[in-house]
Amino acid sequence: MALRSITKLETFLKRYSAPTLYYCLHRSTQSSTCNSTNTDNGSHNTNYNSSNNNNNNNDNKRFSWRSAIRFLVPFSLGALASSVVAGDRELMPTISAKTLTNNRRDFNFIADVVASCADSVVYIEIKDTRHFDYFSGQPITASNGSGFVIEQNGLILTNAHVVINKPNTMVQVRLSDGRTFPATIEDVDQTSDLATLRIQVTNLSVMKLGKSSTLRSGEWVVALGSPLALSNTVTAGVISSTQRASQELGLRNRDINYLQTDAAITFGNSGGPLVNLDGEAIGVNSMKVTAGISFAIPIDYVKLFLERAAARRKKGSAYKTGYPVKRYMGITMLTLTPDILFELKSRTQNMPETLSHGVLVWKVIVGSPAHSGGLQPGDIVTHINKKEIKNSSDVYDALADGKKDLDMVILRGVKQMRVTITPEDP
């Protein structure tokens, strides 16, 4: 910037100072010429003219240098000043930024919630004891989910579908600090989709249980868990509805008013806590329909399950086996009610307008019969063995029929396909 200023100054001086210097020099030349002429005209004036010429020449020289100095000095000083100012402008912004104070502390309320309760959230892996990794020799992971510690002595709450319906498997729990422990299934309620696990460790961080009955629509909530096996993941949103009846979701055998939220929940979040801004669990993440529509089991209902489970443990009649009574297919599904169908059709172009019933395959467990048979997440089952499938109960009835194979008609996008699945016996 300083070099540019000096260059511009030199150009300016050449353009505007030249006439002044020329005038000074020209006047000096004229005086010399006149003096020479006078000298030639008469010798009697030689001494006088010579004296005058010397004086005039000295005066003209003084006049020329004084004019040049008077003209150049201000511009030189101006150039120096402009270069300094220009240099300062490069170092300082033209508009000073407003200083913001305490914004991070005042508005990072989500981070405060996470800091208060994240240590109690765990990652749950289901290991297939029949298949082993080629390099490590360890059982491969068949599925995964989330949970959270509710007692210091190692009691963990999660979803039932995370830990059951998987024969020849073992359950493994990883804590937030990275420690891993084998877990045993202690109690299961398939109707409410809740289960408890136990790991042999004490002094664990415990999640506080809040009240779901005091929630309001629009209230901020935080979902914690391990979506897609990415443990310690946090998403935030609001409560969309506090009273979403199970009948609206096609879950006819359940009497639960689910919490609906727009917090991002996906595979692996199941069983994790839905937390309010006080760091209290107000729900258990259970299922997702589509982006922005997910559901959690309200914590007030969960407390009833925990009370019944504690009573069964005292009587010695708690859940003993990790295996289901029903044949195993390896999917998590959701009934497509009219409301859910309307939402799906409004959010995606990849669904036939004529579709009026079916079951949405939400998750397919790797290595399961459904996975081997070709089912994929997002498929919609409309028929099994030539019978219409209108809700998840129809799928369970088909499993109980005793037929070896299930011939399914599915929709994958707008394309109709057929797949055959052979469920495993318990």
From Swiss-Prot:
Subcellular location, principal: mitochondrion
Domain (PDZ): residue spans on this chain: 329-414
Disulphide bridges, residue numbers: none
GO terms under cellular component: mitochondrial intermembrane space; mitochondrial membrane
Compositionally biased intervals (Low complexity): 31-58
Residues spanned by motif IAP-binding: 79-82
EC identifiers of the protein: 3.4.21.108
Residues at the catalytic site: H161 (charge relay system), D193 (charge relay system), S270 (charge relay system)
Role, per record: Serine protease that shows proteolytic activity against a non-specific substrate beta-casein. Promotes or induces cell death either by direct binding to and inhibition of BIRC proteins (also called inhibitor of apoptosis proteins, IAPs), leading to an increase in caspase activity, or by a BIRC inhibition-independent, caspase-independent and serine protease activity-dependent mechanism. Can antagonize antiapoptotic activity of th/Diap1 by directly inducing the degradation of th/Diap1.
Protein name, UniProt field: Serine protease HTRA2, mitochondrial
The species this protein was found in: Drosophila grimshawi (Hawaiian fruit fly)
The encoding gene: HtrA2
